[in-house]
Amino acid sequence: MESLAALYKNHIVTLQERTRDVLARFQMDALLIHSGELVNVFLDDHPYPFKVNPQFKAWVPVTQVPNCWLLVDGVNKPKLWFYLPVDYWHNVEPLPTSFWTEEIDVIALPKADGIGSQLPAARGNIGYIGPVPERALGLGIAADKINPKGVIDYLHYYRAYKTDYELACMREAQKSAVNGHRAAYEAFQSGMSEFDINQAYLTATGHRDTDVPYSNIVALNEHASVLHYTKLDHRAPAEMRSFLLDAGAEYNGYAADLTRTWAAHGDNDFAHLIKDVNDEQLALISTMKAGTSYIDYHIQFHQRIAKLLRKHQLVTDMSEEAMVENDLTGPFMPHGIGHPLGLQVHDVAGFMQDDTGTHLAAPSKYPYLRCTRIIEPRMVLTIEPGIYFIESLLAPWREGPFSKHFNWQKIDAMKPFGGIRIEDNVVIHENSIENMTRDLKLA
């Protein structure tokens, strides 16, 4: 495999090309991309954890340093002003020398407010991309050039197509996340609490809570019925029944996003349902190919959910087609089949149909689907079906003409297990699908 430095060199060539195209389209001279700034908690001198501007880390793997600036014009070597204060109160990152610094002109910026003297004098035709518009105005950037929608739509649209460098980083993120999942499973088997399982995960991945790309979902038993459960009980439950872990990792700013569900005992109905959801997830992935709408795979999985509801006698005396048509599968899988993945966990432009930002909303029947694009080579997507036992979604079905088809006794017996989600991260290639997660033997 090519070195990361060689892959990064080609990555910058691609970003420069996109920059030339977008600047020509909007008749601009350059883009000034801001890493962001620390924001203090209200009435306090303590800042929130820093989260870098995703458009900044698309160019450079600098994710922990505020007050940095990139100037790119698609022609000249990108310039990075790297914040390097004299500060004995806080840790100061040294001026980077790494695999990527040959491609970037790195300049020390000793004072956060010193960027004004470093920039070209004529700034009326420079666009600002970043989270602090008032800073851009103070630098003389025109108001209509601050986060211009057309420019951002263009950049977001093409972020769906990962470079080889980006794919290499995402494969590395997978490795960390898989290590974490294995450690968390061992912690679950030893009877640990959600809090302690999370600690085991973070230790195995080498991440802090603020480093992971999203808040880990560490859900024992019925907590797995809360789709984004992040509470972390300190005390282990009296009886371990199930464990759902939705947790990722980050490498050079790129995310992994994996989910697994385990039963405490391998011979009950819930364990058999996990196996079947897993099998159907893999079967769906095996059918995927470039040129197909992502919506189609979401709809297909509802057909697979119907098959499982029938097989496990959770819904009875109704055809699978009728279950989907009448949305009896809806309360069991209320979320979408997945989403784009990259610099952000829910990566951008999932609804964009072209580089002008044309929006195609999710179908009204499935409003929580996060992607409506045609899948194409170099896209990275999650495939994360689930079956859940969520009373607030099931309750409306307990009355009315369809109630008799729900096997309420069996459904209620499943509720203490919470739910199931299985999530892999896949790369679309011209004639194949690469399952980064399963390639690392995460069962």
From Swiss-Prot:
Reaction it catalyzes: Xaa-L-Pro dipeptide + H2O = an L-alpha-amino acid + L-proline
Cofactor(s) it depends on: Mn(2+)
Biological processes annotated in GO: proteolysis
PROSITE patterns, per the entry: PROLINE_PEPTIDASE
Alphabetical list of InterPro entries matching this protein: Creatin/AminoP/Spt16_N, Creatinase/aminopeptidase-like, PepQ_N, Pept_M24, Peptidase_M24B_aminopep-P_CS, X-Pro_dipept-like, X_Pro_dipept
Co-factor binding comment: Binds 2 manganese ions per subunit.
E.C. numbers: 3.4.13.9
Keywords: Dipeptidase, Hydrolase, Manganese, Metal-binding, Metalloprotease, Protease
Pfam families: PepQ_N, Peptidase_M24
Positions annotated to bind Mn(2+) 1: D257, H339, E384, E423
Keyword Metal-binding on entry: yes
A single GO molecular function term of this UniProt record: metal ion binding
Keyword Signal assigned: no
Entry binding sites for Mn(2+) 2: D246, D257, E423
Listed GO CC annotations: cytosol
Known function: Splits dipeptides with a prolyl residue in the C-terminal position.
Database matches in PANTHER family: XAA-PRO AMINOPEPTIDASE 3, XAA-PRO DIPEPTIDASE
Protein family membership: Belongs to the peptidase M24B family. Bacterial-type prolidase subfamily.
Record protein name field: Xaa-Pro dipeptidase
The species this protein was found in: Klebsiella pneumoniae subsp. pneumoniae (strain ATCC 700721 / MGH 78578)
Gene name linked to the record: pepQ
